[in-house]
Amino acid sequence: MEYHVQRAEVCPELKGLWDGPAWGEAEVITIDIFRPESSDHHPKVQARLLFDAETIYGIFRVEDKYVRAVHTTYQASVCGDSCVEFFVEPKPDAGYFNFEFSACGAFLVHYVTDATRQSSGDCKDFVELTQEDG
């Protein structure tokens, strides 16, 4: 899967408007890769990304009739809810950022340096980013 992230001509309004003025220049990508341990239910998921000198912007559109949104706090385990994930690797072989967003706006952000799965399901080595880090 290949996706080209466009430079934002204007800062997107952060109002969740899929067809907002800034998003018109962003390519739409359909996400059809699901984790093997997930259920057989696969909702329709699309995303758009933009960037500028300081920020990566993203918006997801999910069409689903089964939505779970229980977790509401920062760094909550939103993977137990209906959620989407976004990964960014700033430098090859130096770790990656893992962003997980729930249907109600709660999110989890980790910087993963060793993705080896432990028996708990967690990655072997990661740092939870604070709200101040963002």
Model feature map: region roles:
Residues 1-134:
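Structural preference for beta-rich elements and adjacent junctions enriched in aromatics
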